[in-house]
Amino acid sequence: MALADLRREYTLNGLRRRDLDLDPIAQFNRWFEQAVTALQTEMIDVNAMTLATADKEGCPSARVVLLKGLDQRGFIFFTNYNSRKGHDLAENPRAALVFHWPALERQVCIAGDVTRLPSPEAEVYFNSRPRGSRLAAWASRQSEVIRDRAELEEKWLQLEKQFPSETIPKPPYWGGYILAPVRLEFWQGRPSRLHDRFRYTKQPDTSWLIERLSP
């Protein structure tokens, strides 16, 4: 089949202005809970999101990460500060997120400013991770070139001996980020590509302007 022939109709739901919460975080939570309920029997990471960053030269990169927290400060994720995304955010602390739930014919796009999560909060999350994941945070020099997989596995085995108990400290180069949204767009697929799109834009008084966009 030709790529040009790959298409589908979107028929599940519509989205009206009166359906929207005045607070975009509350609106996101509503959609997220619906996604969890609808997709809980499928092998899908509902909290998976594409994180787009750019370095100081404006060269973009993107990858899928997992949402690990959400409050009035914003969207929280964790990573190695020395990774490509960590370097990008150090040079250019703005980023975008995309959540795509195709089974619900929905997408949420978010843009905002990024800051590091306070270290005590990052430590609490780090200590909640499985032992293997905590060891992997030490074993991986994320985004650096390595000789082969055996090198990585050997390092992991060394760390198992170095940290024989459940107590494994958080690496100093590992932690969390908060993306504080300034713009969010909620997209609902509709028939004939007449999709519903609503954008929230943060105003100087911290209120949110809600506008319908053309598909």
Predicted regions and their residues:
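Binding-site signature for planar aromatic cofactors or substrates
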Residues: 1-215
